[in-house]
């Protein structure tokens, strides 16, 4: 154990994600690294939001790996890519349909490893590919500059399953997707607006209807 003095903490330098526009308005000044968890009910815009976020990281020059474990590269996912405006001549995001924790660790150990890893979903990663929450957290601590973005199903208002709950507790950024808005729920203050709109028309109809109830 190494104890830090106040001076040590004052001298520490941090690297931040240079978000602009809607992403900055939603999520503010986020430190690079750690676990992000994106959770919400089906049909609310989780997949589209994570693709928008992956596209934004790619635009900023981060190398991105997207593990579409749940949907695979099916026609629906192809449609989501098109809707998000992700195209081969513009974007360089890499996609995989299968990923074990051993695969991920091997990938991260390489010299040109991804800066950001998206895993859809935490339930598929733990149930189908036998990843453990403790191992995910260990990887987060080992690769501190890497960003891990997990999507999660919900049970009521909470993430579904013990593994997802443990990963959420360790997460630096929590984003609840409801009514086509990705709403910042992290530990510290988010952006001025506090949410990112995934689909303007759908969000407008959903929130007007809910406000009138």
Go through the PLM ranges and name each one.
Residues 142-213:
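Phosphate-binding/switch region of NTP-binding enzymes
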Residues 73, 100, 132-135, 163, ...:
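Helical mechanochemical/support elements of P-loop NTPase systems and associated helical scaffolds
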Residues 95-151:
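Phosphate-binding/switch loop-helix module in NTP-utilizing enzymes
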Residues 32-103:
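Conserved P-loop
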Residues 14-30:
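Pre-Walker A adenine-sensing motif
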Residues 44, 72-73, 122-129, 155-158:
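Short acidic, S/G/P-rich loop/turn micro-motifs used as interaction or catalytic elements
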Residues 29-30, 56-60, 88, 109-112, ...:
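Conserved catalytic network of the ASCE P-loop NTPase/AAA+ motor domain
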Residues 1-13:
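Charged, amphipathic alpha-helical linker segments immediately N-terminal to NTP-binding catalytic cores
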């Amino acid at each position: 154990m190494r104890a830090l003095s106040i001076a040590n903490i004052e001298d520490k330098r941090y690297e931040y994600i240079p978000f602009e526009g809607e992403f900055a308005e939603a999520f503010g000044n986020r430190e690079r690294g750690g676990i992000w968890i994106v959770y919400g009910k089906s049909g609310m815009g989780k997949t589209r939001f994570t693709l928008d976020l992956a596209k934004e990281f790619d635009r900023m020059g981060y190398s991105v790996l997207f593990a579409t474990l749940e949907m695979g590269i099916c026609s629906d996912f192809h449609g989501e890519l098109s809707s998000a405006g992700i195209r081969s001549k513009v974007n360089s995001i890499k996609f995989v349909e299968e990923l074990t924790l051993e695969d991920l660790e091997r990938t991260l150990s390489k010299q040109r490893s991804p800066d950001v890893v998206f895993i859809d979903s935490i339930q598929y990663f733990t149930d189908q590919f036998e990843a453990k929450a403790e191992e995910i957290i260990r990887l987060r601590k080992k690769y501190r500059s890497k960003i891990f973005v997990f999507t999660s199903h919900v049970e009521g208002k909470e993430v579904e399953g013990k593994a997802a709950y443990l990963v959420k507790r360790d997460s630096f950024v929590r984003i609840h997707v409801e009514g086509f808005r990705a709403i910042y729920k992290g530990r510290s203050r988010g952006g001025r607006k506090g949410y990112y709109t995934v689909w303007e028309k759908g969000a407008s109809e959903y929130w007007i209807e809910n406000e009138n109830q």
